[in-house]
Amino acid sequence: MATVSRRAYAEMFGPTVGDRVRLADTGLVAEVEQDFTLRAGGYGEEVKFGGGKTIRDGMAQSQRTRAEGAMDTVLTNALVIDHWGIVKADIGLKDGRVAAIGKAGNPDTQPGVDIVIGPGTEIISCEGNIVTAGGIDSHIHFICPQQIEEALASGITTMLGGGTGPATGTLATTCTPGPWHIERMLQAADAFPMNIGFLGKGNASLPAALHEQIEAGVIGLKLHEDWGTTPSAISNCMDVADATDTQVAIHSDTLNESGFVENTIAAVGGRGICAFHTEGAGGGHAPDILRVVGEDNFLPSSTNPTMPYTRNTLDEHVDMLMVCHHLDAAIAEDLAFAESRIRKETIAAEDILHDLGAISMMSSDSQAMGRVGEVILRTWQTADKMKQQRGALPEDGARNDNHRIKRYVAKYTINPAIAHGISHDVGSLEVGKWADIVVWKPAFFGVKPAMVLKGGSIAVAAMGDPNASIPTPQPVHYRPMFGAFGGSLARSSLTFVSQAAMAAGVRERFGLAKQLSAVRGIRGVRKQHMVHNGYTPRMEIDAQTYTVRADGQLLTCESATRLPLAQRYFLF
């Protein structure tokens, strides 16, 4: 039998079992755990498109029609990185969803084929490339629509949050308040190649005004201290969420005016809730909001300006905070408010809590103390910093960082999907889910995608000069593709709403073009459901020194002076 060297095979068909891939310029190494393309019984039946290659009529391309099972699109020889595994596979897409992950080809001439290539099948060659599920940013201030373009080009395909544009309330809080604004924002969402869900304002002590927002189409409610996150408002908001199977996200009381962290925990009453920017620089009970990391019903997340902890982190935060929360540097009380939120001890501990799997999610806090295009980038910078400072995780050996990689990819994919009741549609590369897929060259993993698919259509890609004779000449930059235009846009993206809104027929009432999907299964979600990130330690924060301990272990680390995925990739 003819043989080929491992290197030559990887260069031709991509890595296979036992091969390792470095993720961009980080120190993280992924090792292929399984190769689904070998289901034919071994090597030799791989599919590849191109002149003289195998995906040709009568070879790896069958005669089967779409009705007979041929796929719409097949991504060949992809290295899949997801919470469930790091595997080599072909991926079949049909009707805008993932139809199969396995072995592609022609079942009439090849054994073991479960993804049929036919004359009606498009091919995206992923040999040597990494494929991930589209990212989810669950902390969006919808301040300007251009955020969506920026996020999509970074690999984010779902944005959850609130706002109405650059209104003062939106600059500070992630709320789309009231039925009129909710209707307008749902109508605006039709224009963008992005899955979108809105949060209403949850700060009220009586339920009627909250119920009308749920029925108008929000997927949950946001409690924000700038609107008054009192125990009364918290309790009322939680009652409404329980009645409607929606989520509550909380930005608690930094000043401890209406109560301390213990009072907030008591008002929540053991019910599930999303804790935004759990460390506290983004807001929350000072100095010990990190206490909630030890509560099973709090689903903790970080926003990206504090991630990872670097020598510049503290300096930039005061000015950011003053702008975002409409504060005046000439007023001593405003300045004290800002400074109370910025503590190097808790910021340093935040990195380690992520590495332990105790903080479950990552998000941006877009234009409101966070950078919308850096959720994925900051996640992998944190993973690399923790490997450099803490070494390999106990679950990982000397050969690879697979467990750490799965832990960190889950923070911006499956875990926010579970927390917000949308994991039936998005959050992972699994059969039946919406085909929101990001393709990366390994050298650019986590920082600059090669292309982003929305609902099976290419929505954005790194594309060269449109007047060039081939697609690659400079200037290469992100350009919208056909999936981002016309009727294709509306059919390639989802708008998430509440079950109550779906039952009320908001799509017809508001004249919405996009397909709606109702959030569900939220109220029973707990920390233990956060994939690879369910550790719930006993938390202690010293009120005088701000030192942090988890299960008695002191959590501290140095600020980084160098990071991967940084200036090397952003020369211009």
UniProtKB/Swiss-Prot annotation:
Enzyme class: hydrolase
Annotated Ni(2+) 1 binding sites: 139, 141, 222, 365
This protein's pathway: Nitrogen metabolism; urea degradation; CO(2) and NH(3) from urea (urease route): step 1/1
Modification N6-carboxylysine occurs at: 222
Keyword terms of this UniProt record: Cytoplasm, Hydrolase, Metal-binding, Nickel
Cofactor annotation remark: Binds 2 nickel ions per subunit.
Gene Ontology CC annotation, any one: cytoplasm
Pfam family, any one: Urease_alpha
Subunit structure: Heterotrimer of UreA (gamma), UreB (beta) and UreC (alpha) subunits. Three heterotrimers associate to form the active enzyme.
UniProt record similarity statement: Belongs to the metallo-dependent hydrolases superfamily. Urease alpha subunit family.
Listed name of the protein: Urease subunit alpha
Species of the source: Paracidovorax citrulli (strain AAC00-1)
